[in-house]
Amino acid sequence: MVSILQLQTRTEASPASSASAAATRIFAVRRQQQEQEGEEEEEEFEFQERMDLSGAQGELPIPMHASAAASPFAGMGAHGGAGGGHVVELHRHEHVGNNGQAMAMASPPPTNVAVAAEQEGSPVAGKKRGGMAVVGGGGGVAVKYRECLKNHAAAIGGNATDGCGEFMPSGEEGSLEALKCSACGCHRNFHRKEADDLDADSCAAALRAAAGRHHHLLGPALPHHHHKNGGGLLVAGGDPYGAAYAAARALPPPPPPPPHGHHHHHQIIMPLNMIHTSESDEMDVSGGGGGVGRGGGSSSSSKKRFRTKFTAEQKARMLEFAERVGWRLQKLDDAMVHHFCQEIGVKRRVLKVWMHNNKHNLAKKPLPSSPPPPPQIPPMSMPPSPPPPQIPPMSMPPSPPPMPMPMPPSPPQLKLE
């Protein structure tokens, strides 16, 4: 009876052990393939770093092999057989279902591994590795390399380009020759990199197409989940560029700025004539006390000087004290100065500054002693001057009468017969 039970147990355990052994062999082969691919990627990346002489116009895109078998545990996810790296949920949700449905599968079906290997060898994967036309499958950024910017006259301090207008690879995509331009012979990094963002419609269409292509990699049907915050965004496709682009588009837009003139902070600005300034500049914020007020100053600047305001009584008392001590504080009068400052509520340093600022304006200047006025000399009386002698007018003799002029004799007249 015991032998029959042992035989039956071995018979029942044999299919499970054979399945686990097959899964182990599949994982071992897959790990070996991934190690070989990782070594090839490291060699290609090192070569690209050695060839990168310019360091300008962007960075070299590193080939990213993101497929269904990106992890040795491909197919073992929290969603029950979903291909690793193919479905990205961009929201938080709570799963409501049986624990058996949420558990991971014990081993992936061999068909998924075969399909993943076939997907890696497809032209789509080759396009991802090339990094020439499209970076990131399933919608992303189209990258083009335009004119060559290499300066061939840099050694002599000049600037000269070869005139190459567009990068043309020398070999097939994914090879080392593809990084060299067949037209000018320069590395691809010397050419200007141009990235064109695709619009939202084309990105959504590409995402849907990629989801349709990779639908057969998802395994069994996923259990239905209930979400508290509504439906999320599922990004299909095996590259991080498409996922990052979709994640950026799934984020909520920033709140619009408030309309102009509403919900803004009001700042009170006092006119200058409303601020009572005094003649003293206080260098310390804590200067003054009692009846000493503060000038209008901003609290944002800790180094701003505040002007101390004095009352009329304080000014009169300080003026009287300054005149009494001669507008100068001496060490011999420290006790008297301290007592006076306590009486009027002003610090000693503030009093000293006030006296220094107002010494030339408020100090009573003694008037210079004027000499006695000179004695007034009475004016001397002068005798009156005699009148000028009157000269009689001279009589002119009468003019003689004019003498008649004798007429000359007329010539004799001749008579004609």
UniProtKB/Swiss-Prot annotation:
Compositionally biased spans, kind Acidic residues: 36-46
Residue stretches of biased makeup (Pro residues): 368-417
Feature: DNA-binding region: 303-366
Gene3D superfamilies cross-referenced by the UniProt entry: Homeodomain-like
Record's GO cellular component terms: nucleus
Composition bias, Gly residues: 286-298
An annotated Gene Ontology molecular function: DNA-binding transcription factor activity
Any single GO BP term: regulation of DNA-templated transcription
Transmembrane segments: none
UniProt KW Cell division keyword: no
Pfam family, one: ZF-HD_dimer
Keywords of this entry: DNA-binding, Homeobox, Metal-binding, Nucleus, Transcription, Transcription regulation, Zinc, Zinc-finger
Zinc finger (ZF-HD dimerization-type) residue numbers: 145-194
UniProt main location, coarse: nucleus
Compartment list: Nucleus
Site-annotated residues for Required for DNA-binding: M355
Composition bias type Low complexity, residue spans: 13-22
The protein's assembly and partners: Homo- and heterodimer with other ZFHD proteins.
Its biological purpose: Putative transcription factor.
NCBIfam families the record matches: homeo_ZF_HD (TIGR01565), ZF_HD_prot_N (TIGR01566)
Domain notes: The homeodomain differs form the typical one by having namely 4 instead of 3 extra amino acids inserted in the loop between helix 1 and helix 2.
UniProt protein name: Zinc-finger homeodomain protein 4
Species whose genome carries this gene: Oryza sativa subsp. japonica (Rice)
High-level lineage: Eukaryota, Viridiplantae, Streptophyta, Embryophyta, Tracheophyta
